[in-house]
Amino acid sequence: MKKFVYKYSFGALLLLSGLSSCCPSSYGSTPAKNTAEIKEESVILREEPESGCKKKSSCCLRKFFSRKKPKEKPEPVLPNFKSYADPMTDAERKDLSFVVSAAAEKSSIALAMAQGEIKGALSRIREIHPLVLLQALAEDPALIAGMKKMQGRDWVWNIFMTELSKAFSQAASLGAFSVADVAAFASTLGLDSGTVTSIVDGERWAELIDVVIQSPTI
């Protein structure tokens, strides 16, 4: 009887061990994967889309490094002023007369319409030596009359003086007002050399214009 029990008990154990080797365990173990399946899963993992956070940061980095550097503003080009010994040409005198008469006579609308012509004329007389320009004004009664009319039009005069002062200060920074040139200019117009020198050294351009307008040579 004992032999019979041992025999069947041993057979049952063999049967259970055989079943456990071919069936999943109660803990959910899965059959072993072959090499091809492992490679396929690793490829899928690598191709998995980035999470929202990673996607956002990588996008920000791309934008940061692709951002263009701000363009540097070009430095203003200073005029290459002519020498005081260089006389004005007839064309330059014509351009000066046009600018003064337009600013003195034209209405606001007419000035706006003639803006291109005025700018063109100004660009052509831009490099005339400041003292030569003032001397040309003082020697022409029509230009003196035009300058006085401009003084009566505040907004025109303010714009004119702002641009003129800027150009004259640029000339001063380049050393265009030599002692000899200032003395020759004052002598030509019958002005006191010391007074003119003081005005030029102080860059009081509005005062210099006023002296020229009020003390014409003819």
From Swiss-Prot:
GO cellular component labels: plasma membrane
Main location, first listed in the record: membrane
Keywords (A to Z) from UniProt: Cell membrane, Lipoprotein, Membrane, Palmitate, Signal
Membrane topology annotation: Lipid-anchor
Residue positions of covalent lipid attachment, annotated as S-diacylglycerol cysteine: C22
Recorded superkingdom: Bacteria
Keyword match Signal: yes
Compartments where found: Cell membrane
PROSITE patterns: PROKAR_LIPOPROTEIN
Covalent lipidation (N-palmitoyl cysteine), chain numbering: C22
Signal peptide, first to last residue: 1-21
Protein family according to the UniProt entry: Belongs to the chlamydial CPn_0875/CT_734/TC_0107 family.
Protein's recorded name: Uncharacterized lipoprotein TC_0107
Organism: Chlamydia muridarum (strain MoPn / Nigg)
